[in-house]
Amino acid sequence: MLNREEELRFCKARRAAIALDYQNLNPEQRRAALATDGPLLLLAGAGSGKTTVLIHRIANLMKYGRGSDCDEAPAWAAPADLAFLEGYVQNPDPAQKAEQERLCRVDPAVPWSIIAITFTNKAAGELKERLERMLGPSANDIWASTFHSACVRILRRDIDRLGFTSSFTIYDTADSERVIKDIVKDFNLDEKAFAPRSILGYISRAKDAMKLGKDYLQECEKAGDYRLVKIAKVYAEYERRLREANALDFDDIILDTVRLLQNFDDVREYYQKKFRYVLIDEYQDTNNLQYLLASTLAGGYENICVVGDDDQSIYRFRGATIENILSFESQYKGARVIRLEQNYRSTKNILEASNAVIRNNEGRKGKELWTEHEAGDKVHCYTAMNEHDEAQFVAAQILAGFSAGRGWRDHAVLYRMNAQSNQLEQASSATASPTASSGASASSTGRRSRT
């Protein structure tokens, strides 16, 4: 048995012993990896190593559980255990590693109790690959996936509660547009006035607000908007046809998962009990449905860690709401906030320029990126009179670089909208500069400057 003073020393030594495993992280990264209990907002600036932190955090949860974040010593701890840990911290001995791990473990997490959600298949694939490299085969049991992949797993198990079968089909955007186009034709609507892609945008926004077809129709009829009533009727028919085909579109996958969790207590309780730890990446890009999904899954233990950067929120046009990350602390009282501000990607001059621009944003959480890298080349700013002048300047700079000995492929042009590419194409053609494109072409020729 330990007295109170010894218990405090034991907890301190345990935290220090665990931290030795994560000496490759910087201090703030290490704090994030070792924070296990309760809600955590990780404000991760660009190039700050957030994926590395997520991987080490999951590894810590599985290896040591709550050991790095626990203020209680185990009842079985003896003075000899305290002496061992304090000695190990001062002089780590690989031969004593097994005993150190035994003394530091507190309720370690099993892999299937952890769900880590990110936005893209590429990011999810990288997360899985790096987890497997660090943790071995046990990493395969972690729910590391996109929002849609995680929801499909949940729906395959219980979607019969909503009137579908587990063998449901998933419609992609092209499938959805085809169904909408057929409905527009059947309803004798002008496809130019009621473009299928535009209608899908209305339907997507309605679903994000959790409005089913009949609810949306009633709302539009009450508002008395003739055009919206027509769109709502298309939505209701679209919903009916998908149900008849036992099919879901991309929005349905998350919407129906949220409906399932909200409307069936046993399903909700099963997943809230199952997932002790919920981690959400790119939280600044979440929409209302994704927010509801994350908060519902975390409703059991409230061990939710969200990673994001309010300075990188650019998907409002897709339904993303920055309020999800800005209001995290008010939703979860006592939430910890850790800022990852050390940048491993850029030079000092680039960071100083970006900090100077972004600090003018209103309502931001606030952080100041810094780096140990050299200053690098200065950032030059050119204010063009119009798009033509801008494109001419860019083309001239590239030509000057080529004349100075740089290769064409050493130059990259980033632009905000695809519509800007036409002027750049024309200016590049005038200087005979070869270009390669990345993304869909905005012109009929398909030639574009590379983003």
Give the residues covered by each predicted segment:
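Conserved short internal alpha-helix adjacent to the catalytic or cofactor-binding core
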Residues: 429-431, 436, 443-451
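Short glycine-/polar-rich loops that comprise or flank the Walker A/P-loop
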Residues: 38, 109-113, 138-141, 179, ...
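Helicase P-loop NTPase motor core
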Residues: 51-54, 89-105, 333-336, 341-434
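Short regulatory helix/loop adjacent to the ATP-binding pocket of P-loop NTPases
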Residues: 153-160, 314-330, 354
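Conserved P-loop NTPase-based nucleic-acid remodeling module centered on helicase motor cores
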Residues: 111-201, 382, 395, 437
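Post-Walker A helix-loop "phosphate-sensing" segment adjacent to the P-loop in P-loop NTPases
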Residues: 61-70, 109, 136
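Conserved helicase NTPase motor core
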Residues: 13-18, 22-54, 73-88, 99, ...
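Coupling/switch/interface segments within P-loop NTPase motor domains and analogous charged loops
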Residues: 174-242
